[in-house]
Amino acid sequence: MSARVNHVAIASDQYALNGRFYESLFGMKPSSKPRPARSVVLGDGYVGMNVIPRRDGRTSGLDHFGIEVEDVEDTIARIAKFDSSLSAVKRPPIRPFAAYSAHDPDTNIFDLSQKSSGAQKDVYAENDWVQPRTISHIALRTRHAERCSQFYADVFGLTPLNRPKDSNFYLSDGRVTLMIIPWKITDYYAQDPARTGLDHIGFKVESVDQVKKDMEFLIGENPHMRTRALGYGSEGEARLKLFQKCPLGRFHLTDIEGVHIDVAEE
């Protein structure tokens, strides 16, 4: 199995501006065939990011992630073998990445795409270049972290990484790490509890200091590029401390919508 964790979606009330943020700060490239009324689709040469308008009844922020596999039908069979109560649903052909949507044992939703199927659109058909700032990890905070970790290892062949100093689980496709964090209500003693689900995304960069300088430059060029403040007030301080427990990041920020992002150098 050669599964790749190469898709993430963000729902945003300011989807166009948020897309420009990732393009400007992290150098992500937009699709050569944009559909601006529907979403902003960007890529880093490996991972594709869809910034989609928040629809009625939906929350903003990280929405789902996606995995590319060699054979979708075989993968669906593996999912059923792992747990017969799990299932998948076929997606409309207009979707640029997904052939199916499915879920893990904790109902965390992910999309499935088949490699070289010809169904990929936008950057998912173009994602093949090298750039200095790339998505390094996608973090998921969920109730039954160990079982979900086993699910992604057994079904997709993601490689467990040995990090014995914390309670998290780390699985790699060889480039991107899926980080699975145990969700505990006690982690939210000094703040409003967050739902289970996607927690944050991380980038590998050539220089953290340069990212900080670029952020200042962007705000000077366009005041709408100002991101959310972190660590203010007692609850903000508690949220930041919990975020900073991720060992894969060194500098912490948000996008325009408030999605948590951490960055670290190669």
Feature names for model-found ranges:
Residues 4, 36, 61, 96, ...:
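Exposed loop/turn and edge beta-strand positions of beta-sandwich/beta-sheet ligand-binding modules
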Residues 17-19, 73-77, 208-213:
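Short, conserved charged micro-motifs
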